[in-house]
């Protein structure tokens, strides 16, 4: 069975490395991008099965990346899991979730996040995208 490709887009190097290792231990093929622009380019070249996307990043934020992908007929089907920390730039978790729903993100997790929650959400989104029951 072919490994599912996951694109992980986050500017936090420690989080990215830990999450990449976790997902690879679950037999996913993980590609990393460190900002929104790089993430958008890699989404086009890698054609991942799922994208994990941080909201607050330099160059282009996660909302912008998600909106561009979801409105593109070639990439709009790819499930997107948004991640973000609530803080000065993000007033509340519900605000982030509402924004994500407006741009058609498939799921949302506030940071800090438990590693196993990421795995569970990834597996659920992949099952849904393959037409299986969640």
Where are these regions (language model features)?
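Active-site residues of response regulator receiver
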Residues: 10, 54, 84
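Two-component/phosphorelay signaling modules centered on CheY-like receiver
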Residues: 13-31
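Helix N-cap/capping motif at the beta->alpha junctions
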Residues: 32-41, 62
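Short amphipathic alpha-helix used as the core "switch/output" element in two-component signaling
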Residues: 41, 63-76
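Active-site beta3 strand of CheY-like receiver
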Residues: 46-52
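Receiver (REC) domain active-site loop signature in two-component systems and cognate sites
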Residues: 57
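Alpha4 helix (beta4-alpha4-beta5 surface) of REC/receiver domains from two-component response regulators
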Residues: 64, 87-107, 116, 120
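A Lys-centered signature of the CheY-like receiver
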Residues: 111
């Amino acid at each position: 069975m072919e490994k599912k490709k996951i694109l992980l887009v986050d500017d936090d190097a420690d989080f990215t490395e830990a999450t990449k290792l976790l997902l690879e231990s679950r037999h996913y093929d993980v590609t990393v991008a460190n900002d929104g622009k790089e993430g958008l380019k890699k989404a086009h070249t890698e054609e991942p099965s799922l994208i994990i996307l941080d909201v607050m990043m330099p160059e282009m934020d996660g909302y912008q990346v998600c909106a561009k992908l979801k409105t593109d007929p070639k990439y709009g089907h790819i499930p997107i899991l948004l991640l973000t920390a609530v803080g000065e730039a993000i007033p509340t978790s519900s605000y982030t979730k509402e924004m994500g729903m407006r741009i058609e993100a498939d799921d949302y997790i506030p940071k800090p996040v438990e590693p196993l929650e990421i795995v569970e959400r990834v597996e659920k989104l992949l099952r849904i995208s393959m037409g299986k029951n969640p």
